[in-house]
């Protein structure tokens, strides 16, 4: 018999035990994965098509009533709930004589249920200890522990604490919680701690309980509770992490630990045998089972019935959790090894991988199929997690970034102390923001997590993304700045090709007609981003990244009639809708609808809390809500109340700083100390009063797009219009004599501008960092992968993708009386633009 190599043995694990080939299962059961690479199974895995079909048949073939009744339909629901509860226990090999299962919303709800039980079980309160790798929901229990607690920062600390339990006899109730698997990096913690704690705790009165967060583990690994003496007292999990659907969680309780809930104060419908409300305030709790006492109110019985279909579908497709464990272990090892092997041209590692030294991707007992990492460039500088996630999204690759609701694991891996993080919080760092690197360190990580239906193509697709966009093949800066021809500048050389304002934030542009001078204010072009659309539920401003159809909302300013005219739909379509709103703030006599009343409302715009005036007229809300399919209404920035300012920018020589890394020392003179930063007021713009781009730069970018003919997934090499950059000013060059002498990206060296016959002065604040919104076609609302893909390769400064320049009126202009300079404070298509260059820049 021919021997089998270790490599061959590994690949045999790929899909072993599945009903069919992985790709065949994906094509039939997971149509939502078409043209998509999904690598966020730790967040939730995906539901199978046949699961939804099976559940649909259940609902349409049976009548399920509220379980709290004696009707036939209600009893059917009760019977099915009981059956599914037993099936769930057996899935985890939990003996129903030893364990009970309580249905809850999710793992967090189960944790809170245990915490409430511990709090109410004794007047003296309880002590709480948790492992540093705990999910945020486990950390939160500490706020209920009146006896204090401890965060164990290592396994050794836990082992030492366990060994000392028998030395200290205490009546205090104690709870120790930890994750079976870190949701950050997939490291698996010792299951044996539960038995060790129980054995040690029995010598002190058995008052130490264990809580195991199994939510991350059970998504790809079996959980074996067959030995009740070694099992946790409380195990929490979420079924959607295993099956994708239904959205349901569970608390598995060792019955011997059930007395913790005896004194739980709250009771809900269905958990009591009798309640007195008049006179004597008394109630009798149900005693038949633990779940009867804890499942408050009507159970989500439809979801529980769906869980039955989920169990059956999962077993039919994948056979067992052990099969899934082997499959994902093989893929995770391959992905880890490939990322770990990536190097830049100079040998610098591309990936900083955050794997515990205690774990091994070859050992399922120590490591799950999760990989946490960050990227570095060839100089060792960090690449922002947000940029990587945005680029991945343009390629239809779904990943996760941030602190991952794992504050201890993330901060420990990144080297942040509590004092450090408090300081960064004061500096503006918040969960979910794009402060990717602060004080030279990443603030979060990138996470890839695998699931039952992950295949080899998913692994290859992500690694190829990193290789194409982040692995530097050679030391060159040719792609950073386009070549500039060494010819004397013949002034005037630049002029305004087009002027655009965006009256409604994130909607289409209004292009200023040729020959018309347009007012400029400190906040930018008159009427620019003075309105926005806000969600009627949350108050958050809508944007094209979430709602690409906003590009098809076309506002225009009619100064003759003093109205904002809005049309919806593709240009030239016959079914366009029309709305008109008065430009006059107090005028309610509108052409097609009434302004009615406005109400002040707090809204979130680019992370800022902004007070806007929302239009309460139902026709206004209906106009936008019907078109976008989201409940929203129009809102306006209040007059004379700008509390928003342009973001602080790097000095105009930022490109020069970047280039210094590649040229001889002394090539550039030392920069003078920067002047104090000025504040530039804005309305609802993202970052600055005015955004400027160059036609020459757009042309050069399109040349690069066309040159890169390799089409990745659904992307194309089609040229992009300047409109995708949503600039206020497009500057072009006068090239009548020398059409081939364009100077793309020359604007990177501009530090100031004079525009128009009155030479109105502008300051250049810095480069515009770009996001995936530039991939939305402004004429169709269709999302593509360009130009972001090409920009990611050719336009990076300090690891940020940039295109265009932020500008504002010069401070010397705003000190003058605007009324005395009304004509000067205007711009027009065709106005001459005279740039001033950084002091050390020469052609």
From Swiss-Prot:
It comes from the Eukaryota. The active site is at residue 405. Pathway: Cofactor biosynthesis; molybdopterin biosynthesis. Residues 657-836 form the MOSC domain. Signal peptide: none annotated. Sulfurates the molybdenum cofactor. Sulfation of molybdenum is essential for xanthine dehydrogenase (XDH) and aldehyde oxidase (ADO) enzymes in which molybdenum cofactor is liganded by 1 oxygen and 1 sulfur atom in active form. This is Molybdenum cofactor sulfurase. It comes from Aspergillus fumigatus (strain ATCC MYA-4609 / CBS 101355 / FGSC A1100 / Af293).
């Amino acid at each position: 018999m021919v021997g089998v190599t270790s490599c061959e043995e590994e690949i045999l694990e790929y899909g072993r035990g599945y009903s069919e080939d992985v790709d065949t299962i994906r094509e039939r059961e997971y149509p939502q994965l078409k043209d998509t690479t999904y690598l966020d199974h730790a967040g939730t895995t995906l539901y199978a098509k046949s699961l939804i079909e099976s559940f649909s048949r259940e609902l349409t073939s049976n009548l399920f009533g509220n379980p709290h009744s004696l009707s036939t339909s209600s009893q059917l629901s009760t019977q099915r709930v009981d059956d599914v509860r037993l099936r769930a226990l057996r899935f985890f090999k939990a003996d129903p004589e030893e364990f009970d299962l309580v249905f809850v919303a999710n793992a967090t709800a189960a944790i809170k249920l245990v915490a409430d039980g511990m709090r109410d079980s004794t007047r003296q309160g309880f002590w709480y200890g948790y492992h540093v790798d705990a999910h945020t929901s486990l950390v939160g229990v500490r706020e209920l522990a009146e006896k204090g607690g401890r965060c164990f920062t290592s396994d050794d600390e836990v082992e030492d604490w366990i060994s000392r339990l028998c030395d200290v006899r205490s009546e205090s109730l104690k709870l120790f919680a930890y994750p079976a698997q870190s949701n950050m990096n997939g490291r698996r913690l010792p299951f044996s701690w539960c038995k060790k704690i129980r054995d040690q705790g029995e010598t002190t009165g058995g008052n130490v309980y264990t809580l195991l967060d199994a939510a991350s583990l059970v998504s790809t690994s079996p959980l074996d509770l067959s030995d009740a003496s070694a099992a946790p007292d409380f195990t929490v999990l979420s079924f959607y992490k295993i099956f994708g659907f239904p959205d349901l969680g569970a608390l598995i309780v060792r019955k011997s630990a059930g007395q913790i809930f005896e004194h739980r104060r709250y009771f809900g419908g269905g958990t009591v045998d009798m309640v007195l409300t008049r006179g004597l305030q008394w109630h009798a709790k149900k005693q038949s089972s633990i779940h009867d006492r804890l499942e408050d109110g009507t159970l989500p019985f439809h979801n529980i019935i769906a869980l039955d279909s989920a169990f059956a579908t999962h077993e039919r497709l994948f056979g067992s959790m052990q099969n899934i464990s082997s499959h994902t272990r093989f893929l995770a090892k391959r992905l880890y090894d490939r990322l770990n092997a990536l190097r830049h041209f100079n040998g610098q590692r591309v990936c900083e991988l955050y794997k515990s030294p205690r774990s091994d991707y070859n050992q399922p007992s120590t490591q799950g199929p999760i990989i946490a990492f960050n990227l570095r460039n060839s100089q060792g500088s960090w690449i922002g997690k947000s940029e990587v996630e945005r680029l991945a999204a343009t390629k239809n690759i779904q990943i996760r970034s941030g602190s991952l609701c794992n504050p201890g694991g993330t901060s420990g891996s990144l080297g942040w102390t509590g004092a450090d993080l408090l300081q960064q919080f004061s500096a503006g760092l918040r969960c979910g923001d794009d402060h990717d690197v602060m004080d030279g360190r990443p603030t979060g990580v990138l996470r890839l997590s695998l699931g039952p239906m992950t295949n080899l193509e998913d692994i290859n697709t992500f690694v190829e993304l990193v290789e194409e966009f982040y692995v530097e093949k050679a030391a060159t800066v040719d792609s950073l700045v386009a070549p500039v021809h060494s010819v004397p500048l013949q002034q005037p050389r630049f002029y305004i090709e087009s002027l655009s304002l965006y009256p409604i934030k994130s909607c289409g542009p209004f292009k200023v007609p040729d020959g018309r001078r347009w007012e400029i204010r400190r906040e930018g072009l008159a009427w620019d981003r003075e309105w926005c659309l806000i969600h009627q539920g949350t108050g958050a401003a809508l944007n094209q990244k979430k709602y690409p159809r906003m590009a098809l909302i076309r506002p225009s300013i009619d100064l003759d009639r003093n109205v904002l005219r809005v049309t919806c739909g593709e240009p030239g379509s016959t079914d366009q809708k029309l709305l008109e709103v008065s430009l006059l703030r107090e005028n309610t006599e509108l052409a097609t609808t009434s302004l009615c009343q406005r109400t002040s409302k707090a809204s979130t715009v680019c992370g800022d809390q902004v007070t806007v005036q929302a239009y309460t007229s139902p026709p206004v809300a209906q106009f936008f809500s019907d078109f976008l399919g989201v409940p929203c209404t129009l809102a306006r920035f209040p007059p004379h109340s700008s509390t928003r300012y342009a973001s602080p920018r790097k000095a105009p020589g930022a490109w020069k700083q970047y280039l210094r890394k590649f040229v001889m020392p002394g090539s550039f003179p030392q920069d003078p100390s920067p002047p104090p930063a000025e504040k530039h007021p804005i309305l609802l713009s993202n970052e600055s009063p005015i955004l400027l781009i160059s036609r020459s730069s757009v042309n050069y970018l399109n040349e690069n797009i066309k040159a890169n003919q390799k089409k990745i997934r659904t992307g194309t090499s089609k040229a992009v219009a300047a409109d995708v950059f949503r600039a206020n000013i497009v500057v072009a060059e006068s090239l009548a004599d020398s059409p081939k002498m364009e100077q793309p990206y020359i604007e990177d060296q501009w530090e100031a501008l004079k525009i128009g016959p009155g030479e109105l002065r502008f300051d250049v604040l810095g480069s515009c960092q770009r996001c995936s919104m530039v991939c939305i076609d402004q004429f169709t609302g269709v999302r593509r992968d360009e130009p972001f893909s090409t920009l990611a390769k050719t336009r990076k400064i300090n690891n940020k993708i940039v295109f265009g320049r932020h500008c504002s009126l010069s401070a010397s202009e705003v000190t003058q009386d605007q009324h005395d300079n009304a004509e000067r404070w205007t711009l027009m298509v065709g106005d001459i633009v005279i740039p001033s260059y950084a002091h050390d820049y020469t052609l």
